[in-house]
C-alpha cells in the first residue's frame, strides 16, 4: 500500500536534486551578484550537448564527460561575462533581461542548427543502470547517483561560499565594490569566477538531465521556468533555500503527474503561489 507512495517520493526527491543542480548556479549569481541571467539554462543545454558529443562521437565514458560539461559551460560563461555581461552589472533589470533572453534565443537556434530538433540519447555506464532493492522498494541507481551528486554540490558550495576567503570576497564585492577594491580584492576576477561557477553547475546539471528528461534545443526555455520557480521559492542567494525548494517542487511535480495527471504542471505553480504568499522572500530568503 505504501510502496507506490514511497516510490513517488523517491522519484520526486531525485528529480528535485536534478532541478537543484540546474538552479543553484542561478541562485548564486542572482542572489549574490544581483544579475538577472535568463540565459542560465542555455549553459545547461551546452553542458548536455558537450556530453552527448563526447559520448556519441568520441566514445568517452559518460562519467568522464561530466567535468568537461562543467568546464565548457564555465569557459563560455567567462567569455560572455568579460565581453557582454560585465557591461550590464549596473544596468536596469530590464536591460539584463533583454540581453540574456536574446542570448537564450540565439543558443536555441544554434543548437537546433547543429544538433537538430529531436532528443538524442546517451549511453550511461552499467553501474548506473537498473535498480537496487531497499525495504521492498526498487530504487533507480541513476536517481541515487543524482541525489549523491546534489549532496556533494551542496556541501562544497556551502563550504566555499560561507567559510572560505573566496566567499568573503564575493560578498564584499557585491556589498561595496569601491571598498572591496580598496582592500585589494580583484572585483572583476571575483565576479568572473562566480559566474563561471554558476554556469558550470548549470552545465553539469544539463549533462545529468539527459538520462532523466532528455535534451533538445527547447531545454533552454522549458527548464528555465522550473529554475526560476526554485530560485524564487527558495530565496535569492540561499543554497539551503534552493535545496529545500528543489525537493518541494520535485516531489510536487512528480506526485501531481502521478496522482492527478489532468492537472499537468499546475501543482508546482500552486505550490509557488502558496509559499510566496506565506514567505514573500522565499523559504530562506533575506527579508
Question: Can you name each region flagged by the protein language model?
Answer:
Residues 1-22, 50, 61-65, 91-97, ...:
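Membrane-interfacial amphipathic/re-entrant helices at transmembrane-helix boundaries
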Residues 10, 32-79, 83:
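Membrane-embedded helix boundary and interhelical linker motif in transport proteins
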Residues 15, 134, 138-215, 239-245:
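Helix-loop-helix "hairpin" substructures at the membrane interface of multi-pass membrane proteins
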Residues 59-104, 110, 244-249, 279-280:
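Alpha-helical transmembrane segments within multi-pass membrane transporters and channels
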Residues 83, 114, 175-182, 186-189, ...:
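Cytosolic-side transmembrane-helix boundaries in multi-pass membrane proteins
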Residues 88, 92-163, 190-193, 255, ...:
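Transmembrane helix-bundle core of multi-pass membrane transporters
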Amino acid at each position: 500500500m505504501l510502496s507506490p507512495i514511497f516510490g513517488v517520493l523517491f522519484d520526486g526527491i531525485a528529480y528535485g536534486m536534478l532541478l537543484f543542480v540546474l538552479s543553484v548556479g542561478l541562485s548564486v549569481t542572482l542572489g549574490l551578484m544581483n544579475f538577472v541571467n535568463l540565459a542560465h539554462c542555455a549553459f545547461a543545454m551546452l553542458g548536455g550537448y558537450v556530453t552527448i558529443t563526447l559520448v556519441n562521437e568520441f566514445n568517452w565514458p559518460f562519467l568522464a564527460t561530466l567535468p568537461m560539461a562543467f568546464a565548457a559551460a564555465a569557459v563560455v560563461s567567462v567569455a560572455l561575462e568579460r565581453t557582454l555581461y560585465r557591461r550590464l552589472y549596473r544596468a536596469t533589470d530590464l536591460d539584463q533581461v533583454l540581453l540574456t533572453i536574446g542570448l537564450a534565443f540565439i543558443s536555441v537556434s544554434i543548437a537546433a542548427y547543429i544538433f537538430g530538433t529531436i532528443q538524442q540519447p546517451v549511453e550511461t555506464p552499467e553501474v548506473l543502470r537498473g535498480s537496487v532493492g531497499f525495504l521492498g522498494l526498487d530504487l533507480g541507481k541513476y536517481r541515487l547517483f543524482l541525489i549523491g551528486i546534489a549532496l556533494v554540490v551542496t556541501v562544497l558550495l556551502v563550504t566555499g561560499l560561507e567559510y572560505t576567503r573566496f566567499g568573503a570576497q564575493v560578498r564584499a564585492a557585491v556589498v561595496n565594490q569601491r571598498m572591496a577594491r580598496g582592500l585589494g580584492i580583484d572585483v572583476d576576477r571575483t565576479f568572473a569566477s562566480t559566474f563561471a561557477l554558476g554556469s558550470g553547475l548549470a552545465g553539469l546539471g544539463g549533462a545529468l538531465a539527459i538520462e532523466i528528461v532528455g535534451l533538445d534545443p527547447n531545454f533552454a526555455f522549458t527548464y528555465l521556468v522550473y529554475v526560476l520557480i526554485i530560485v524564487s521559492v527558495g530565496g535569492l542567494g540561499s543554497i539551503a533555500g534552493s535545496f529545500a525548494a528543489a525537493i518541494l517542487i520535485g516531489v510536487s511535480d512528480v506526485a501531481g503527474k502521478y496522482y492527478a495527471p489532468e492537472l499537468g504542471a499546475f501543482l508546482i505553480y500552486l505550490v509557488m503561489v502558496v509559499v510566496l504568499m506565506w514567505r514573500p522572500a522565499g523559504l530562506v530568503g533575506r527579508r
